[in-house]
């Protein structure tokens, strides 16, 4: 029955007990291990796929026994009787197979498998128990017949219908419909029944069956099985679509939406292919979708068209599957297993053809090319998904999980029989194919070695059980390590490889017989796992020759891992030995995994490490040394990227990487590596930049230096890509450093456009005169190409692969190969995309289009003209080959001139082009060639002007590209051969010279002037000042610039007279002047625009040098070639950052070594070093003095830090405060002065700058904070920011150059320019100009226009975890001096909430200037008031003067008569100077204009306010009316005459009056005077003493001698009027209009009747002193936001009335609905909390609360009595309890979106408060006063029923002003008609 018995199976399988334990653990039942062992024994032969899930270990045994143990029985090996016997054996043996017993139509499942070839194999049950319910066959419409475990009726009996309906219904209405409609309900249940068993993987984890059912749950959870071909197709399609989704293939729905012509393709399929004629549209579309990814050949037959989409999504749409997955799916799908013959009409061209293909094929043996493997002969056995999930499923889901994967088995009986018939026909090549499976059969199934379940390899069966012993032995001798078991399955190895000790013991115990040696070798080789699939994510998917464990086992692991660890900076020997001895260490595993991936995916790693394999078998060694095989395009690109860089070097010699030394074949470099490293100053920066590239990312520093050294002397490419700077050295040494080896020496100097991009530091002109001919700065970034020397050995004939598709066509050899052509064309991708848009190339792939272009390029000039190409920088020899034609097209070379205009290189290699043209010896007349050269010269000059690519990232490095004239000189070999051609040819090539335009004339004149000697000439432009003043219309600025230019010219020896005189007279060509305007037409735009933008640029104007004996000339714009030297200093903007100004001065000092633009300079020779150094020192000194002058210039209030702090809010205010409290070290580190960095080098100057900024509070124009260090500064001060948000930061602290470098500010500039002018910015210089202009606007308005830039460099947002803020040393610094009280008197500090828009300022008590001697970071005492030092009679707030506007304000609290220098219009009169006391035994009624006084009876006199037994009736005698009139503002200002003249007017004293009647009269006669025409918006501040200069009236209060109330409190003022602070910020027009309206139109409104209430009754309400309304009014007068007004009972006079427009200036709103978003409460503030939450105002230790509410869908921060305002419905007891809980917590923070009440870890008190605030009603009437129109901050006020709303609007209007006259006439006519 089975190959071996169960007893033999137990002996041979070593880990059988472990497998049985694992099965028992996974199922969790009560069966024994013996039963599970027997079950596994049966399944081992019945279902071979279980071997992959549970790998076995075979004990040492003879080979024949091992083969017999592992073989797979034949399909007919187990008879039906055996099946019946097994079924009768009971559960202890093996499970009973599924038997269909329902009716006569049902047969056993095994018979069904024979009759229906679609069913492959027998399903496996996980639990060996019999089934109690028979299986049924169900025909599902359009899906085929399936075998379900239970019938539909049984399923309905076992299902919980209500639970099911909750899962599947869409709504309650849908559920009711199902319950009421029986037919619909049954139909829905039937569909669910079908889906439940057809698609078991889509089941919900919820158990929908009843708890008690007759059918076991395992039976109910079984999955259905397909019965016919249609069902198999349905399951296969579902599996295929799942597999496509797993492999990142788009779904079918997405495919249909994005395939534009899918309907056309389906129609073509139905018309052209008979297989799809009978199918409907949906089926054809699904077949095309599956074939599109599984059989990609269909893409070539039916041309597809995608809808517009992104490149990433397009790549996803066009991706393909791996060969193994596609082959598996192709076999499982019937419609794709045998595709239509039409698909074979066009075979796709493979994309794996590379130049390294030959080397790969050379590693194979000679017999490997004869292997013919048919894909249909291979059977890929996939491990069962159900078994892989066996251990993770629950017991009730175990059976369903195992059975649901039956369709995954793909081994059919017919395939096995085919292998049996052809087994004896295998030859030696078949054995070799088994030895080298990766090369012979690449399409076989492969498994990844990453997952433990798939670590073992499953191979295709190549050897049958009855194969001869000789063949097996021969196979074992050839490649025992890759031997494939004859049963078709390799013995899977264990998860960990065998240790060497165990293998040694096994080899020692084995006898020396050949058979036994072979057997032991088999056991030894079981751990050699080959051909594993590895996914490297973005680098692609590969097939590696061996697994990671096998690789680690054979390679010299200890040496490799030591080298890797040392390279990663692990130097400690103890740590190294510890890591090396532990391969399982995560760090070692990570590094070795990376080495393993790079070893096979990249070739350069093998050259950098000395590896060796401990493998005696040569075939195993060859397998270990193989390369990886790419499986997708990313992998192919990864391998080609490394192969292309090393292709030529590998062809010369295959040697490991060693530092190259001087050999006979390679000429020695001019200097050694050590000397090179000593002379290069920026070598570390170059190494860092190179290591950012993929090519050098994994190399060490020394290796990168070696590569740069070799590339530096191999060609100009490395010098251009990575610019180097040499240290100061003699000119001889410079020439030696810049020279090339003898082999390459003649190339770079003769090619002026391939010269070296290097600079030197501090080189003199004399030492650099010779090197200047070889050194030119290139501004254009050129990508790295192959060294020039690599291309010299490339043959000019094409490779055999260039026309492989047309072997029969005779085609002449092309000049270069296709691969070389592709590597030198820079825009090949763009050409291919443009060609694919044409009709003739539309259906072709990219490779085919490139091949067609390659052929057309060398077939004639048509292709070159139609699609212009650009070549990368290369030598003239290579360029000649690229532009030449094949032999038969030599006559077409006459078109070469046209090709020169289109096939341009990225760096203009004009000399190379001309040299290649001249070598063809074309007969051209001299005049024609000269005309051609002149035209070419003019064209190149135009291109230099107009076609410059603008870079926004490195604008500071922009430099106009030089145009060397000698590149277009007529070659001598062409001119000397003229006249030797036939006369006919000369006549044909004769070219007539056209009329020269002005550009050509200028270019020719420029060339003529450049070739002449000019001694002692000074070039001065006649319109120089016009260009200097371009864009500046201010005469003052123009005069300033002209004066600066004159001063600079005089200091440097220039003669200014010629320049100024040239403005009026036209220049004449003479020995002293040249027409620069006409000559410089062909000049680059950079020079003109730089001269234009020299507003204050004395540095940009170089001086002329004295002529010498040798021929010399001057450089007019010597310093204009680099924008780093452009110093555009505006009067209102800052300038370059330290990054741009911190460059080495090598560009200035070695300025004469640069080859500049023609027409902008004339070369100078013989200038002395001393003269240049003195000039440079003068320039630097002038710039330094200029920067110092700007820095210490007198600035306006916008440049004052105190003003900026007062007018800023939020984060910006915090930053200004931080900058205001910097210390000296922080100031020098975080800030920078434009053009004044040298000021920081001197200690004296640094202290001066520090005192000017920090001590005196100035912020100069040219001072900025370094943007890269801003986050570090904030972090060190305790301000935690995840990202820098520039919208919350003022533009004043940044530099425009840093904004252009680190943000998208340049993009905003470009967009704003386009929006304003409709044109794009042409060059970088224009961009710099516009950047300065826009930044100046942002500076002037102190805000970003039109939008705030975003940080583009993410390095600025990097985390700063190591920098911890030092809170202990942070002290908040005072802005203004606060009046000090008596030192002996205790000071009470009251916290006053502040808003961002208003700041309470105090006038300094010092006579001249502020005394700012506090420590940095000291707390801002601006918002805190000393209550004990406040005069009680001075509580009426005066009009506050901004301390930043007037610095001469003086005050004193000791002498009332002290004058101060504030304008008279800003002063207010104070009231009663003596203390106010309460009346005694008197009460007054102010119901009219006069006060009526009444005596209090003796029995009513004694009132004990401290008594708790006082009640309302006992206090009714003290009732006074609480008036509720509108807020009145009484400004007593001086006349406008005094306000304008600022005269000192002495105040006349008003005699005191104790008459109460006179007091009432005086109060009612107060009037508001007209406000001045120019009203200054000021900020209210604390009450000051009355000024003696004020000529105003005083309020007369009560007599001091009246009877007093007897109580224990301090006497309180009862008649003081507190001015509302909000009215002080009214606009001028509104204030004036209000005053006028109050004078002309008095309002006589009757007083509002209120219930009389006495002061004692008000005191009794709160029972606390602080809740007293009168005292609270006095306290609130100091607050800038919460000012209250005492109410009066008498009617106000007309002069004191306020217009309704006053409400608009002080926005107030009555709110009845709000959403509480945030609420915070702090019982006692700490310094850390103030800094962390940016709390403004309160001192440490004060109580603080704030809320964020949403009113009318807008968020507002509110302050004030929050608890009583937000929760007015609370009783006094509940409110006190709430306050008690908050004080008990100490700190509480509520957020509505945070469900803290559900978190059990949160404090219970906080959870209760969260629930309370969540459930609090949102309807809560209260009033809120907003700080300004933005309504971001406000103060809440409890809303009273009697209060009159302040935001009433006047609804009256004039209809005639709003309605048109014709409409009014129509209304009147209609009214007349209606009346009549």
UniProtKB/Swiss-Prot annotation:
Pfam families: Tea_C, Tea_helical, Tea_mid. InterPro entries: Tea_C, Tea_mid. Its main location: nucleus. It is found in: Nucleus; Chromosome; Chromosome, Telomere. GO terms for molecular function: DNA binding. Residues 442-456, 467-477, 505-516, 783-793, 1681-1691 have a biased composition (Basic and acidic residues). Keywords: Chromosome, DNA-binding, Nucleus, Telomere. Residues 1110-1122, 1133-1145 have a biased composition (Low complexity). Residues 348-376, 1629-1640 have a biased composition (Polar residues). Residues 333-385, 441-519, 779-810, 1098-1178, 1629-1650, 1679-1699 are annotated as: Disordered. It comes from the Eukaryota. One of its GO terms (cellular component) is nucleus. Part of the MTV complex that associates with the HipHop-HOAP complex to form the terminin telomere-capping complex involved in telomere maintenance and prevention of telomere fusion. As part of the MTV complex binds single stranded DNA in a sequence-independent manner, protecting it from degradation. May mediate recruitment of the MTV complex at telomeres through interaction with components of the HipHop-HOAP complex. Component of the MTV complex, composed of moi/modigliani, tea and ver/verrocchio. Interacts (via C-terminus) with moi/modigliani and ver/verrocchio; the interactions are direct and require fully intact moi/modigliani and ver/verrocchio. The MTV complex is recruited to telomeres by the HipHop-HOAP complex, consisting of HipHop, cav/HOAP and Su(var)205/HP1 to form the terminin telomere-capping complex. This is Protein telomere ends associated. It comes from Drosophila melanogaster (Fruit fly). The gene is tea.
């Amino acid at each position: 029955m089975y190959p071996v018995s169960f007893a033999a199976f137990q002996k041979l399988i070593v880990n059988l007990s472990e497998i049985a334990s694992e099965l028992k653990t996974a199922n969790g039942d009560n069966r024994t291990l013996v039963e599970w062992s027997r079950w596994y024994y049966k399944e081992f032969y019945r279902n071979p796929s279980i071997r992959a899930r549970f790998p076995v270990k075979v004990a040492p045994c003879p080979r024949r026994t091992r083969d017999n143990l592992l073989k797979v029985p034949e399909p007919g090996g187990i008879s039906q009787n055996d099946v019946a016997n097994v079924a009768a054996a009971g559960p202890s043996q093996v499970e009973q197979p599924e038997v269909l017993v329902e009716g006569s139509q049902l047969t056993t499942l095994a018979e069904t498998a024979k009759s229906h070839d679609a069913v492959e194999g027998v399903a496996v049950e996980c639990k060996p128990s019999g089934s109690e319910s028979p299986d049924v066959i169900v025909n599902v419409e359009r899906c085929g017949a399936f075998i379900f475990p239970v019938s539909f009726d049984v399923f309905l009996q076992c299902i919980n219908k209500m639970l099911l309906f909750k899962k599947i219904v869409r709504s309650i209405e849908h559920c009711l419909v199902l319950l009421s409609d029986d037919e619909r309900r049954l139909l829905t249940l039937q569909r669910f029944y079908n889906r439940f068993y057809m698609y078991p993987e889509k089941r919900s984890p919820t158990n929908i069956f009843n708890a008690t059912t007759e059918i076991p749950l395992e039976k109910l959870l079984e999955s259905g099985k397909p019965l016919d071909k249609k069902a198999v197709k349905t399951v296969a399609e579902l599996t295929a679509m799942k597999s496509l989704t797993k492999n990142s293939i788009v779904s079918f729905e997405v495919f249909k939406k994005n395939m534009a012509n899918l309907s056309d393709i389906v129609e073509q399929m139905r018309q052209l292919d008979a297989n799809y004629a009978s199918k409907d549209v949906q089926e054809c579309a699904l077949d095309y979708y599956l074939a599109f990814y599984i059989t990609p050949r269909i893409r070539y037959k039916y041309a597809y068209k995608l809808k517009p989409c992104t490149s990433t999504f397009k790549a996803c749409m066009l991706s393909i599957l791996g060969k193994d997955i596609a082959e598996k799916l192709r076999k499982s799908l019937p419609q794709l297993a045998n595709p239509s013959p039409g698909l074979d009409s066009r075979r796709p061209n493979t994309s794996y053809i590379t130049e390294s293909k030959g080397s790969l094929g050379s590693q194979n043996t000679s017999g490997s090319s004869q292997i013919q493997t048919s894909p249909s002969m291979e059977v890929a056995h996939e491990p069962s998904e159900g078994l892989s999930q066996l251990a993770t499923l629950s017991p009730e889901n175990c059976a369903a999980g195992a059975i649901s994967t039956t369709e995954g088995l793909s081994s059919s009986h017919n395939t096995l029989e085919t292998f049996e018939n052809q087994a004896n026909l295998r030859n030696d090549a078949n054995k070799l194919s088994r030895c080298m499976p990766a090369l012979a059969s690449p399409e076989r199934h492969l498994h990844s070695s990453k997952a433990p379940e798939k670590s073992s390899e499953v191979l295709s069966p190549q050897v049958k059980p009855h194969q001869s012993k000789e063949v097996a032995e021969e196979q074992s001798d050839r490649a025992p390590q890759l031997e494939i078991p004859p049963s078709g399955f390799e013995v899977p190895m264990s998860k960990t490889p065998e240790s060497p000790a165990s293998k040694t013991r096994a080899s020692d115990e084995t006898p020396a017989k050949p058979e036994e040696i072979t057997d032991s070798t088999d056991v030894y080789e079981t751990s050699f796992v080959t051909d594993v699939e590895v996914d490297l994510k973005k680098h692609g998917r590969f097939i590696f020759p061996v697994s990671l464990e096998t690789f680690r086992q054979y390679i010299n692991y200890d040496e490799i891992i030591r080298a890797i660890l040392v390279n990663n900076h692990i130097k400690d020997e103890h740590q190294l030995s510890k890591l090396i001895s532990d391969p399982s260490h995560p760090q070692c595993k990570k590094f070795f995994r990376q080495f393993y991936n790079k070893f096979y995916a990249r070739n350069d790693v093998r050259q950098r490490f000395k590896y060796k394999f401990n493998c005696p078998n040569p075939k195993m060694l060859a397998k270990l040394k193989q390369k990886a095989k790419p499986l997708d395009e990313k992998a192919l690109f990864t391998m080609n990227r490394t192969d292309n860089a090393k292709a030529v070097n590998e062809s010369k010699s295959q040697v490991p990487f060693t530092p190259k030394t001087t050999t006979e074949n390679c000429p020695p470099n001019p200097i050694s590596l050590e000397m090179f490293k000593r002379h290069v100053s920026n070598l570390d920066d170059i190494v860092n930049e190179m290591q950012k590239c993929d090519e050098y990312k994994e190399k060490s520093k020394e290796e990168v230096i070696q590569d740069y050294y070799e590339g530096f002397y191999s060609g100009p490419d490395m010098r251009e890509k990575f610019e180097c700077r040499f240290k100061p050295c003699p000119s001889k040494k410079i020439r030696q450093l810049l020279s090339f080896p003898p082999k390459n020496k003649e190339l770079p100097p003769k090619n002026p456009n391939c010269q070296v991009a290097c600079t030197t530091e501090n080189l003199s002109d004399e030492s650099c005169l010779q090197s200047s001919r070889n050194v030119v700065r290139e501004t254009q970034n050129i990508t790295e190409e192959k060294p020039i020397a690599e291309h010299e050995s490339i043959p000019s004939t094409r490779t055999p692969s260039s026309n492989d598709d047309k072997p029969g066509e005779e085609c002449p050899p092309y000049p270069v190969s296709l691969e070389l052509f592709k590597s030198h064309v820079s825009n090949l991708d763009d050409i291919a995309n443009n060609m694919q848009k044409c009709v003739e190339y539309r259906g072709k792939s990219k490779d085919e289009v490139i091949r067609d272009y390659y052929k057309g390029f060398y077939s004639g000039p048509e292709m070159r003209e139609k699609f212009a190409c650009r070549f990368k920088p290369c030598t003239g020899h290579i360029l000649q080959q690229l532009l030449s034609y094949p032999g038969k097209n030599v006559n077409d070379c006459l078109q070469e001139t046209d090709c020169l205009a289109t096939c341009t290189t990225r760096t203009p290699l004009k000399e190379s082009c001309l040299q290649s043209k001249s070598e063809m010896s074309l007969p051209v007349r001299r005049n024609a060639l000269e005309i051609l050269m002149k035209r070419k010269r003019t064209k190149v000059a135009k291109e230099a002007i107009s076609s410059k690519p603008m870079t926004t990232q490195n604008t500071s490095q922009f430099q106009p590209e030089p145009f060397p004239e000698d590149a277009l000189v007529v070659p001598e070999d062409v001119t000397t051969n003229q006249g030797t051609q036939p006369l006919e040819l000369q006549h044909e090539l004769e070219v007539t010279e056209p009329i020269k335009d002005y550009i050509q004339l200028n270019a020719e004149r420029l060339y003529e002037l450049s070739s002449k000697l000019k001694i002692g000439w000074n070039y001065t432009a006649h319109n120089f000042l016009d260009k200097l003043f371009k864009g500046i219309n201010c005469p003052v600025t123009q005069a300033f610039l002209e004066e600066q230019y004159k001063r600079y010219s005089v200091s440097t020896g220039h003669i200014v007279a010629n320049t100024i005189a040239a403005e009026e007279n036209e220049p004449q060509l003479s020995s002293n002047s040249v027409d620069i305007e006409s000559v410089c037409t062909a000049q680059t735009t950079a020079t003109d625009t730089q001269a234009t933008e020299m507003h204050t640029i004395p540095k940009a104007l170089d001086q002329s040098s004295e002529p010498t004996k040798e021929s010399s000339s001057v450089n007019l714009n010597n310093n204009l070639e680099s924008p780093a030297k452009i110093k555009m200093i505006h009067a209102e903007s800052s300038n370059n950052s330290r990054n741009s100004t911190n460059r080495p001065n090598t560009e200035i000092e070695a300025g004469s070594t640069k080859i500049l633009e023609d027409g902008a300079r004339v070369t100078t020779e013989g200038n002395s070093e001393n003269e240049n150094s003195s000039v440079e020192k003068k320039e630097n000194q002038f710039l330094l003095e200029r920067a110092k002058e700007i820095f210490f210039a007198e600035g306006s209030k916008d440049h004052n830090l105190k003003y900026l702090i007062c007018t800023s809010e939020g984060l910006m205010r915090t930053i200004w405060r931080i900058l205001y409290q910097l210390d000296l070290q922080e100031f020098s580190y975080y800030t920078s002065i434009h053009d004044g960095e040298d000021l920081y080098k001197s200690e004296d100057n640094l202290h001066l700058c520090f005192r000017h900024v920090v001590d005196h509070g100035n912020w100069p124009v040219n001072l900025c904070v370094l943007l890269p260090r801003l986050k570090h500064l904030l972090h060190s001060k305790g301000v935690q920011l995840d990202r820098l948000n520039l919208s919350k930061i003022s533009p004043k602290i940044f530099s425009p150059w840093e904004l252009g470098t680190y943000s998208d500010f340049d993009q905003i500039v470009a967009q704003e320019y386009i929006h304003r002018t409709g044109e794009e910015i042409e060059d970088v210089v224009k961009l710099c100009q516009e950047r300065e202009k826009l930044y100046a606007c942002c500076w002037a308005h102190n805000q970003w226009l039109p939008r705030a830039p975003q940080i583009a460099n993410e390095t600025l947002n990097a985390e700063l975890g190591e920098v911890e803020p030092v809170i202990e040393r942070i002290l908040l610094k005072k802005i203004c001096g606060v009046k000090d009280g008596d030192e002996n008197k205790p000071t009470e500090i009251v916290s006053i909430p502040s808003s961002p828009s208003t700041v309470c300022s105090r006038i300094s008590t010092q006579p001249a200037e502020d005394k700012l001697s506090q420590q940095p970071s000291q707390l801002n005492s601006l918002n805190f008031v000393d209550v004990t030092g406040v005069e009680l009679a001075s509580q009426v707030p005066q009009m506050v003067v901004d301390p930043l506007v007037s610095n001469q304000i003086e005050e004193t609290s000791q002498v009332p008569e002290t004058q101060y220098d504030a304008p008279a219009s800003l002063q207010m009169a104070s009231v009663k100077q003596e203390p106010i006391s309460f009346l005694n035994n008197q009460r007054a009624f102010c119901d009219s204009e006069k006060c009526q006084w009444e005596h209090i009876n003796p029995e009513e006199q004694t009132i004990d306010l401290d008594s708790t037994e006082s009640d309302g009736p006992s206090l009714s005698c003290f009732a006074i009316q609480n008036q509720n009139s509108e807020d009145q503002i009484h400004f007593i200002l001086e006349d406008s005459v005094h306000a304008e003249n600022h005269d000192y007017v002495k105040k006349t004293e008003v005699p005191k009056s104790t008459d109460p009647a006179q007091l009432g009269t005086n109060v009612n006669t107060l009037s508001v005077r007209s406000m001045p025409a120019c009203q200054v918006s000021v900020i209210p501040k604390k009450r000051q003493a009355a000024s003696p200069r004020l000529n105003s009236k005083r309020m007369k209060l009560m007599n001091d001698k009246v009877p007093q109330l007897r109580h224990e409190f301090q006497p309180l003022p009862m008649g003081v009027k507190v001015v509302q602070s909000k009215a002080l910020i009214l606009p001028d027009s509104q204030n004036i209009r209000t005053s006028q309206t109050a004078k002309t139109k008095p309002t006589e409104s009757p007083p509002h009747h209120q219930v009389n209430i006495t002061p004692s009754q008000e005191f009794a309400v709160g029972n606390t002193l602080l809740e007293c309304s009168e005292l609270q009014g006095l306290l609130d007068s100091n607050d800038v936001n919460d000012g209250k007004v005492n109410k009066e009972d008498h009617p106000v006079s007309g002069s004191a009335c306020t217009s309704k427009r006053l409400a608009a200036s002080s926005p107030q709103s009555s709110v009845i609905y709000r959403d509480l978003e945030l609420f915070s409460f702090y019982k006692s503030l700490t310094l850390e909390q103030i800094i962390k939450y940016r709390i403004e105002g309160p001192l440490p230790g004060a109580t603080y609360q704030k809320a964020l509410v949403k009113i009318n869908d807008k968020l507002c921060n509110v302050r004030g009595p929050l608890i009583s305002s937000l929760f007015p419905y609370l009783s006094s007891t509940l409110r006190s309890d709430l306050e008690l809980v908050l004080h008990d917590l100490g700190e509480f923070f509520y957020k509505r979106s945070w469900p803290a009440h559900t978190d059990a870890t949160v404090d219970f008190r906080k959870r209760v408060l969260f629930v309370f605030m969540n459930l609090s009603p949102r309807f809560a009437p209260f009033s809120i006063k907003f700080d300004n129109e933005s309504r971001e901050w406000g103060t809440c006020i409890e809303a009273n029923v009697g209060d009159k709303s302040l935001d009433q609007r006047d609804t009256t209007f004039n209809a005639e002003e709003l309605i048109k006259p014709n409409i009014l006439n129509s209304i009147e006519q209609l009214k007349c008609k209606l009346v009549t």
